[in-house]
Regions:
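Substrate-binding rim/cap in mid-to-C-terminal beta-strand-loop elements of soluble/periplasmic
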Residues: 359-398, 467-509, 523-527
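Bacterial Sec-dependent N-terminal signal peptides
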Residues: 1-26
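Short, structured active-site-proximal loop/turn typified by the sulfatase FGly-forming signature C/S-X-P-X-R
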Residues: 43-92, 149-153
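Second-shell loop/turn segments in exported
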Residues: 39-45, 68-71, 121-128, 245-252, ...
Length: 527
């Protein structure tokens, strides 16, 4: 009898201990921070200018992966953030970019536009309707039966909504015309604390007095990105034109504005205060001012990283005060791309040229008319993709596969074209690494019939967006950092897939990974 009682007591103590251990290992708050255009090489290059609270703390106390990889092409804000929080690629989540060509209407579609919902403090109608799979936010809301506090705060609309997913309780971004924090009726009522902030402390009350100049003595900025040395710099936002808020969102002050709202949020909600895990997704900006190149703003990009270092330190201190870093899991990563560099100076004689997709489409249509007779065989084009007229091809009883193959054979003869792929080859062709990344970048609802691969060093001229993009195969190094509850500090240079982020965070929170995430959680990350 005594033995049975003793056994029962031991079992009870063990189970209680395991439950306590499991509870302590589940963070009360998860903070996901995606920093637009953050580069691992710049983190290292400017390290002599950092303080102790930001990057240096992350490198000392966090688990740092210096070479994270996105498994698809044409990265931008929407596609990168969607990939982080769905744990998959555009092939499954449907988000191929900030905008794309709709195959049915032949019109440009923005990734978060939705006329069915009204904007709050904005005229933009917004929802995540184009996001085809579940996100980390969605799975947490399902797992907690809606009890979790799930919110998203970002300078831009796309990053806020893609991180918030379908089921979050709110997503907020800076209105590019008014500077107010905005939202959408899709996520329900607008929180009073955001409205109060807009009415009392909104950016529009302060922007005319803000001036961005060097944070450190100008002699500290020694990283050379231009042949013309800068003496100093000064940018203000006092003009009355509508683009002053757009420019502000490309300055380091945009990150401080995010922190200001995070402070209000943590003060006015119960996030991280109970045993139900909560999720706060944030975004910063680390690209060039006004999306210019490093050759124009060499000193600014260095100062931006110095200020980003301070802003990160402020965020870590804020979370520690309000929730406790021991109760919080933080993951930080990048969107994995940079604004296009200008073409190389001609005096260096690096092979280059210009590829005009509009001219390519016109020549292809003339060729197809010569082969198959009169008709508009090319419906439209976008970026490096060409959309064929399926209805005409069917009416003429032509073989679509043959038309695609002939088109590829013709296009690949053009100057600056390295290869051309039909959609059928991308989806059904023999596997190789290039085909795999193209397939991951493909979406049946919006991708073209032909994808044109342009030679590195050549500039793609886009008539739709009035832009010029120099093709570079080498993407900037993408950092991935985990910090906080149960994380084992270490610096690793082994490549890891960004698709593993969502399953890893889901594992920490003890919930399902998003429904299209097939990668395994990262191993060795726990203490």
């Amino acid at each position: 009898m005594k033995e049975r009682i003793l056994t029962s007591l031991i079992t009870a103590f063990v189970l209680t201990g395991l439950q306590a251990q499991n509870s302590s290992q589940t963070p009360k708050l998860v903070v996901g921070l995606t920093i637009d255009q953050l580069r691992a090489d710049y983190i290292e290059a400017f390290s002599a200018m950092y303080g102790e609270r930001g990057f240096k703390r992350l490198l000392k106390e966090g688990r740092v992966y210096y070479n994270a990889e996105y498994d698809f092409f044409n990265l931008d804000r929407s596609s990168a953030v969607a990939s982080v929080y769905t744990g998959t690629t555009p092939y499954y989540n449907g988000i191929v970019g900030d905008r794309w060509m709709d195959r049915n209407s032949l019109r440009i579609v923005k990734s978060v536009d939705d006329p069915n919902f009204m904007g709050i403090y904005t005229s933009e109608s917004t929802s995540p309707q184009h996001l085809l799979v579940s996100t980390l936010s969605d799975e947490l809301m399902v797992a907690t039966q809606g009890r979790a506090e799930v919110y998203s705060i970002a300078p831009t609309r796309e990053m806020a909504v893609m991180a918030a997913g379908h089921a979050a309780k709110g997503a907020f971004w800076i209105n590019s015309e008014t500077g107010k924090w905005s939202g959408t009726t899709y996520y329900g009522s607008f929180p009073e604390w955001v409205s109060a902030y807009n009415d009392r402390e909104g950016l529009d009350f302060r922007i005319n007095s803000l001036v961005w100049g060097p944070y450190l003595p100008v002699t500290s900025y020694k990283y050379v990105t231009t042949e013309v040395p800068q003496v100093t710099f000064k940018h203000d936002f006092s003009d009355e034109r509508l683009d002053k808020f757009k420019k502000f969102k490309t300055s380091p002050y945009a990150n401080d504005e995010v922190n200001r709202l995070v402070n209000v949020f943590l003060t006015n909600t119960n996030i991280g205060k109970d045993n139900t895990p909560d999720l706060l997704t944030l975004s910063y900006y680390a690209g060039n001012y006004a999306h210019k190149s490093n050759t124009e703003y060499a000193m600014e990009i260095q100062d931006a990283y110095v200020r980003l270092d301070n802003t990160l330190g402020d965020l870590l201190d804020l979370i520690d005060r309000k929730v406790g870093l021991n109760n919080t899991l933080i993951f930080i990563t990048s969107t994995g791309y940079t604004d296009p560099d200008p073409a190389d100076p001609p005096q260096y004689r690096i092979p280059s040229g210009e590829f005009h997709i509009k001219r390519c489409a016109a020549l292809l249509n003339m060729y197809l008319m010569a082969v198959y007779g009169q008709g508009q065989y090319v419906e439209t084009y976008y970026d490096r993709q060409i959309y064929l007229n399926h209805k005409l091809i069917e009416e003429k009883k032509l073989d679509l596969t043959e038309v695609m193959n002939r088109s590829c054979d013709f296009v690949v003869q053009m100057s600056g074209v390295r290869s051309a792929y039909s959609s059928q080859r991308i989806l059904l062709g023999a596997w190789d690494p290039q085909i795999e990344k193209l397939r991951n970048s493909f979406s049946a609802n919006c991708s073209g019939d032909l994808y044109i691969e342009v030679m590195p060093g050549w500039s793609v001229i886009s008539e739709y967006s009035n832009t010029q993009k120099v093709i570079r195969e080498a993407y900037p190094s993408v950092p991935l950092i985990f910090l906080g509850a149960g994380v084992k500090p270490e610096i690793l240079y082994t490549p890891v897939k960004m698709a593993a982020v969502a399953p890893t965070v889901a594992h920490f929170m003890r919930i399902r990974a998003p429904n299209a995430a097939s990668a395994s959680p990262l191993t060795g990350i726990r203490k």
